[in-house]
Amino acid sequence: VTTYGFEYALYQAGSSKQLVLVTTLVYPGSPAEKAGLKRGNLIVGLNNEPITTDNYQQLPTLASAELMVQTHSSQKVVKMQAVSMYEDPVVLDSIYRWENKKVGYLFYNKFNPLSCEKLISVCKRFKNEGVSELILDLRYNSGGNSKVHQLLASMLAPEENVARNDVYLKRVHNKDYEEELRQKGEPLEQLLQPQLELTIEGNKYDYDVSDANIGITKLYALVSGKTASASEAILIGLRPYLDIEIIGETTRGK
């Protein structure tokens, strides 16, 4: 994808049209990181113009951009050229010791099929190092591929539920549409399962997550108003099987 390698949230500024972009994430190795942009920076201008409701949507489409960044006491110009790069959605994974327990932290930003191998690797590490509780940070995750959240769920759910292929999610539609889906061969149910097949860029891949089931007893989910779709689905699907505490704002509801 052609990108500057950062994400942001929009906030209304002084006038009815004026906006401020607040940097929420800067991808490692991106033009944004190389230009010195950091999480929490306030962006108030784009190409010598204030950012407004009329022009903020231009930013992702521009091949180059000059951003005006507001600091505590001054402003500085940040220049960037967009590049084609993979934005790794596994932003951060780490392990902490708390009250004689090991707690894993996974900041996951998009259910992207290209991230499956890294997700499996991270979950294997959590398992091997004895992680018993997990903080899953989905605050900026607006969704993605349904098979990928099924794969992650199969590494988070209790191992016995995965071994039984318990129902993870069930789609409910009117009878006509359900029949149409059946004729297309699209299942109405997704199961917890140790082996999954995904199609990535036209190629089929088989993933085995049986050695990557972490065995956690509790999941803490960090959410926000940007948390949507697949991010909401994984929390709904895991609730019957896992103790989940949701922390944050009301999710988008997509």
What are these regions (language model features)?
Residues 2-52, 113-118:
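PDZ/PDZ-like domain segments forming the peptide/carboxylate-binding groove
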Residues 12-13, 29-31, 43, 49-51, ...:
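Solvent-exposed loop/turn segments at secondary-structure junctions
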Residues 20, 116-123, 149-153, 219, ...:
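Extracytoplasmic/secreted envelope proteins and their assembly/folding machinery
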Residues 43-47, 106, 125-144, 222:
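Short acidic catalytic loops
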Residues 39-41, 73-77, 101-104, 129-134, ...:
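Loop/turn elements at helix/coil->beta-strand transitions in domains of secreted/extracellular proteins
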Residues 146-218:
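Gly/Ser/Thr-rich loop/hinge elements
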Residues 6, 32, 40, 67, ...:
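Terminal peptide-recognition signature
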